């Protein structure tokens, strides 16, 4: 190996997770794009890792454009009529499995949103299929819920709404980390945006499609 030169040092070298990107250049929406993206993910299994359990991965997921029509139908089942695309946000929230802790975290989230002038429309339990998940991954599996938040009427710039959501995400996380016992916290906001949503977990790349029936 060549010796160090200038500011370079071999210790700076590091590997990274695999990333794929799928888009329709004409802006046409289709579930096929999601299926194609999951296929890309599955073809990057070599970029992930697993331990002695072949069915417990070190993490994999997918970010997609907010599926407005799908979320609209799902929220109707909960008695909620979502606004038009861009006038609400969808978030993926990991809550603790233990009911008491989950409700404590939810209460803090609700109060934080109210303090920031944001209206929570509803929470939706994310359906999952755990049949192919290893015991180690199952032991740390969170309770996954999606939260839907209305954009305040006085906010017309979508970037302003996105900044407000960023503040909510960080403010809530800080409050929960400072008020709930740290050895009991299982709270994490995987994504919170009007534009995109993330589906992820301690999975292998091949498990994402089956684990999340939404996809």
Set out the residue ranges of the language-model regions.
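N-terminal segments that mediate ammonia production and transfer
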Residues: 1-215
């Amino acid at each position: 190996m060549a010796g160090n030169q200038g500011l370079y040092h071999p210790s700076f070298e590091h590997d990274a997770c695999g990333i794929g990107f799928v888009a329709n250049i004409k802006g046409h929406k289709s579930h096929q794009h999601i299926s194609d993206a999951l296929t890309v993910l599955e073809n990057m299994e070599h970029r992930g890792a697993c331990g002695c359990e072949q069915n417990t991965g070190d993490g994999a997921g997918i970010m997609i454009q907010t599926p407005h029509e799908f979320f609209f139908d799902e929220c109707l089942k909960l008695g909620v009529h979502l606004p038009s695309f861009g006038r609400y946000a969808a978030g993926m929230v990991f809550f603790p499995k233990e009911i008491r802790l989950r409700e404590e975290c939810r209460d803090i989230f609700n109060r934080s949103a109210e303090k920031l002038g944001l209206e929570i429309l509803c929470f939706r339990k994310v359906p999952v299929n755990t049949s192919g998940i290893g015991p180690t991954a199952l032991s740390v599996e969170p309770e996954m819920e999606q939260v839907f938040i209305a954009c305040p009427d006085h906010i017309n710039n979508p970037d302003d709404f996105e900044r407000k959501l960023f503040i909510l995400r960080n403010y809530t996380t800080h409050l929960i980390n400072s008020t709930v016992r740290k050895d009991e916290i299982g709270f994490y906001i995987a994504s919170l945006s009007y534009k995109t949503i993330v589906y992820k977990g301690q999975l292998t790349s091949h498990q994402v499609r089956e684990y999340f029936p939404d996809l």
